[in-house]
Amino acid sequence: MKRKEGKKIKIVIGLGNPGKKYEKTRHNIGFIAVDNLRKKMNISDEREKFQALVSEKNIDGEKVIFFKPQTFMNLSGNSVIEIVNFYKLDPKKDIIVIYDDMDLSFGDIRIREKGSSGGHNGIKSIISHIGEEFIRIKCGIGAKEKDAVEHVLGEFNQTEQKDLDEILEKINNCVIEMLSVQNLDRIMQKYNKKKEKLK
């Protein structure tokens, strides 16, 4: 069923790679964050549609769709364009994308309204289909001096695991505020700062 006139829809997209092999890797922080949101909201049902795993919930009269492309990271845009076209979405207003960023320290998040891919292949794929103007939440996974591919496809180490719940809670709160508060500038000011030392 396509979007009805005046019906508000928001899509919260988490990027990652499908399959057990990747589910606990740093590159899958987008999937992990979306699953955490679904858990907090008691959303258990998930179905396959638009080459993605999809679930939804009505929040304050707005349909919110939680969306995990199953195309593998580099083809994420193929999945995203399907739901954008189906619901006739405006990417600038209706989409939030959560993904990993090696250029940010572990635990930092940055909100952006638009921009380039920054070398992230999932974002590059999405941009190729819908352009650069969509809100994204970049989640820092650090990189240090490690090989980039080895780092992003590696699992969180013990130190990172200890902090992960707190970081996911921060992402969760950020998304909830985005869905309920219209003042994105205020939200960006709140979250776009380096994390304090985690306890």
Positions of PLM-derived features:
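Nucleotide and nucleotide-moiety/phosphate-recognizing core
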Residues: 2-113, 124, 128, 133, ...
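Hydrophobic alpha-helical segments within soluble ligand-binding/sensing domains
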Residues: 119-122
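Extracellular serine-dependent O-acyl
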Residues: 139
